[in-house]
Amino acid sequence: MTEGSDGKTIDGMSLKRIENLIDALKDESYQPKPARRTYIPKKNGNMRPLGIPSIDDKLVQEVLRMLLEAIYEGSFENISHGFRPKRSCHTALIQVQKNFTAAKWFIEGDIEGFFDNINHDVLIGILKERIADDRFIRLMWKFLKAGYIEDWTFHRTYSGTPQGGIISPILANIYLDKLDKYMKEYACQFDRGDRRAMNLEYKRYSRKIWWLGTKLKQTEDKDTRKELIDAIKQHQKNRMHLPSVDEMDEGYRRIKYVRYADDFIIGVIGSKSDCEAIKEDIKNFLGEKLKLTLSEEKTLITHGNRKAKFLGYEIYVRPFTDKTLRGEKSGVLIKAYGKKVVLEVPMFTMRDKLLYYEAMEIHQFEGKAKWKPTSRTKLLHLDDLEILDAYNREIRGFANYFSIANNSSHLNSFKYIMQYSLYKTFARKYSTTARKIIAKYRHHKDFAVFYEDKKGGKKMRVFFNGSFKRKTTAMDASCDYVANTIFNTTVSSLIQRLKAGKCELCGATENIEIHHVKRLKDLKGKEPWKIQMIGRQRKTLAVCIPCHNKIHHGIID
């Protein structure tokens, strides 16, 4: 159970504690605690600060989040995908893939230290545009100014959203919704022309086809007709591989914009000088209206046929020849030229992830880098099932995130390294060889670990054997929108169980509070409270104070 800065956890939560919280909110005596700062590793090797709020602050923030979502969610723009219901990185990427097909340039947006640099005065001003409740605004001010504790020292916060706060994501969306609406208005001013001018070469072939078709109607000679038909087919074939419009038409401009949290990408049909002007305008808007800084170095302008980066993917536009595009009735080839946005998982991302997991080493051989699977020292203390689960979880998570990549089959390389790293980890754990481990754990075609469940039944779990077939829609790929999990149950469910006023162990009806465990799999033994929690697959149990004390002292019947 993770403690906040006040040392409290959800364990011991009761209706009385909630009622005291409500009273403090009513008389405005409630004061958020400073978050306890810790650090988690970033993928680039640096450390990211993370604030852990108190459990009371988590409760209050969850209520605030629900209120803010009810007020703002319906007014957010369709191009915003971060931290929103039924939206994800995948929905953002698929929107790029559908809407950026004609882009000549990409602008990769990067805001310097966004979450730490949200201006409090600007944020409160934005909230006041929709919220007239002064008590709500004063409470928001308290959270923004709550600060954090690091190495037993209190630090004030002068900018940014609550450290590790549940409300931080929606506050970020409310803040950057101003940018979204600015870009929507900007597109209306920037866009020019109803359609591109026709490609002159395409037009020339069309005229030849029309002229030959006219002659064909006037000719009855079989040989002449055959020659004309062959010529028409050849011209049609040549025309199919050309764009029907002039892709360099200066009279036609478009801009497309997609954002996920503080990452955004812009597709531009226009010139590079147009892109430079757009970048400068966004920089000025962010600085003047939102007091944010657009990174000059990281906000890149990339040609459409070169790889831009967005949400961990590499993105570029390429022509394609699709000879399956035929008329529904005639079966005649009607179009063979087009462009599409390609999403790819970068090889360097696979490399960095495998190195981060310490699942491989890189050796130089004849001037080339060779990836070599290796055992993982940090997993050796785990049992067989825990090691297998760790590998499966890592492979599944990585494969799921990159499942919409056009080159998703490259994930087989990732799986191969992880698979042989697993073999070597088992081999090192048992002081044997990978070959012997494979023979020992093979079950049919799978690598399998057998174990007993809580009831003593024999179970089997196998190494990841899923497919890396590309998913084409966000509905196929798991959504990465993370629900706010203060508890494993919802706040309302927890409060309802407290309001029921009955101990779930002995049936007592007074002084009910919540017992909480960190992980269900750590529960061993046949005590009634453990059986109940395991049976319900629930980390929380509503119990009376005497039963709760007995649980903690290990003396419950």
Regions found by a protein language model. Give the residues of each.
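Non-catalytic terminal/accessory segments
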Residues: 1-557
